């Protein structure tokens, strides 16, 4: 998608659809005057309340290539960044559904929006562009089109070809800068969604490594891939144990972005890369197993966030670590009751082979501390269904041994719209993962499942004082039938970038 920023009045821009944003207050006060000035031939009905993400379609008398369709987009109270992101997302969905290619947003009131939301115009421009890219996203690369009926081919959604931010006036330079950032962040988040949406037969651990290499080429940072031989040499027993039932080899990917100047901090991001999770010998139920292609969401988010950080030129060193494999049953697969030795030397009793993510993360967390000793370690993983039970599908679980880090991640969640909620890491939970035959057990029984998983991971950070674990099992992937686009969400990319920008 091309993005154009112009000082030209929005009503004079060549476009298929023109968007006017209104808060609830502005809808009552200004809508009549604004719409009359555009030549809109009818007013919205009383059902349109300008709630955040609510839209209404109107028409106007237009000449030439000016937009005849006008969308009213509600931003609710207009007090948060998320109000504007929701509105832009809804507008993009509607534009794609109408098979229209050029979308124009009226940005002339951006100073008022900035005052209401306490955001800078540059930040709001980025948010609007991110929202449009998110709403316009479609995953259809695996469709051949051969079964489409001739008469329905014209009805296939067409993605937005150009986004125009119009009426920018004296804020042109700031909006251009913000739009550029929004294009980077939105594109990287959508690449993460592409990876997560790929089924297991299209995305192996080696394919995921190749995607990281391509991200490195685009972002200009170094990517190193360890093959199975190197993983064996390093003694990554957790990753190797999970991979035992697979015919596909594992990989361990290192992404290393270094800024041009001196880095203010070194941040390690660890992403779970289980490309398909059958549960292994502890086989999952058939219903919903197809969605387990999304069990590498943490890896996709880490790859995308580092590419975005590099493209934005953030003054931080950001190291990404991605242990990758699928988790399959088979004659050589690990079994419940097995005892494995991880890279750290800590032995683990495997009570359930479907608690595999923590095994591969154990090696990656230890490697991060041992090789880089970073200022901060953050891991992201679709780790536990228990987190969904606790927090639902919209919020991620947050665990940290550092109060200040936890607070920073929470605030980044609020600003990015990718919200997290902190859960405890109290010592009492250690009792639940004790083993009679090994140093630690990989499951903790029925209760507090998301907490015991985090407590397990904590044992592999080798005493690091600034670590956080984010369980994204709920918000990483949306099932069909919801109000959002089904499939991968890319949850975590904006969260990490807001956090990294805060440290910049």
Curated annotation (Swiss-Prot):
Matches recorded under SUPFAM superfamilies: Macro domain-like (SSF52949), Zn-dependent exopeptidases (SSF53187)
PANTHER family named in the record: CYTOSOL AMINOPEPTIDASE (PTHR11963:SF23), LEUCINE AMINOPEPTIDASE-RELATED (PTHR11963)
UniProt-annotated catalytic positions: 284, 358
Keywords attached to this entry: Aminopeptidase, Cytoplasm, Hydrolase, Manganese, Metal-binding, Protease
Cofactor details (free text): Binds 2 manganese ions per subunit.
Superkingdom of origin: Bacteria
Protein name, entry field: Probable cytosol aminopeptidase
Gene Ontology, cellular component aspect: cytoplasm
């Amino acid at each position: 998608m091309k993005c154009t920023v112009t000082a030209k009045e929005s009503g004079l821009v060549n476009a298929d659809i023109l968007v006017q944003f209104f808060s609830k207050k502005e809808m009552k006060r200004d809508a009549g005057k604004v719409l009359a000035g555009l030549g809109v031939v009818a007013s919205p009905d009383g059902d349109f309340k300008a709630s955040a993400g609510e839209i209404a379609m109107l028409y106007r008398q237009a000449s030439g290539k000016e937009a005849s369709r006008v969308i009213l987009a509600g931003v609710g109270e207009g007090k948060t960044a998320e109000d504007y992101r929701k509105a832009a997302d809804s507008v993009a969905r509607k534009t794609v559904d109408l098979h229209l290619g050029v979308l124009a947003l009226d940005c002339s009131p951006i100073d008022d929006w900035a005052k209401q939301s306490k955001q800078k115009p540059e930040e709001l421009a980025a948010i609007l562009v991110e929202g449009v890219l998110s709403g316009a996203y479609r995953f259809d690369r695996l469709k051949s089109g051969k079964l489409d009926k001739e008469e329905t081919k014209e009805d296939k959604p067409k993605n937005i070809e150009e986004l125009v931010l119009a009426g920018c006036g004296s804020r042109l330079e700031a909006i251009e800068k913000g739009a550029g950032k929004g294009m980077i962040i939105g594109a990287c988040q959508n690449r993460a969604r592409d990876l997560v949406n790929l089924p297991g037969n299209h995305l192996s651990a080696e394919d995921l490594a190749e995607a990281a290499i391509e991200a490195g080429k685009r972002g200009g940072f170094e990517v190193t891939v360890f093959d199975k031989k190197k993983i064996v040499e390093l003694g990554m027993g957790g990753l190797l144990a999970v991979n035992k039932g697979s015919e596909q080899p594992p990989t361990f990917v290192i992404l290393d972005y270094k800024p041009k100047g001196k880095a203010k901090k070194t941040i390690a991001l660890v992403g779970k890369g289980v490309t398909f999770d059958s549960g292994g010998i502890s086989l999952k139920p058939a219903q919903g197993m197809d969605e387990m292609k999304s069990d590498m969401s943490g890896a996709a988010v880490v790859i995308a966030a580092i590419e975005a950080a590099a493209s934005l030129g953030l003054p931080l060193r950001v190291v990404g670590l991605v242990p990758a494999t699928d988790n399959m049953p088979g004659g050589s697969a690990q079994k419940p009751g097995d005892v494995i030795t991880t890279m750290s030397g800590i032995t683990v009793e495997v009570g359930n082979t479907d608690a595999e993510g923590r095994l591969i993360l154990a090696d990656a967390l230890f490697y991060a501390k041992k090789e880089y000793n970073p200022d901060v370690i953050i891991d992201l993983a679709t780790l536990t269904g228990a987190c969904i039970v606790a927090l639902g599908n919209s919020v991620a679980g947050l665990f940290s041994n550092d109060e200040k880090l936890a607070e920073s991640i929470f605030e980044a969640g609020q600003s990015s719209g990718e919200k997290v909620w902190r859960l405890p890491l109290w010592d009492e939970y250690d009792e639940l993962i004790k083993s009679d035959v090994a140093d630690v057990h990989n499951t903790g029984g029925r209760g507090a499942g998301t907490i015991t998983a985090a407590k397990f991971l904590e044992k592999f950070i080798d005493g690091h004082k600034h670590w956080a674990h984010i369980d994204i099992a709920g918000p990483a992937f949306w099932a069909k039938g919801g109000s959002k686009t089904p499939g991968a969400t890319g949850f975590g990319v904006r969260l990490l970038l807001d956090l990294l920008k805060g440290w910049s």
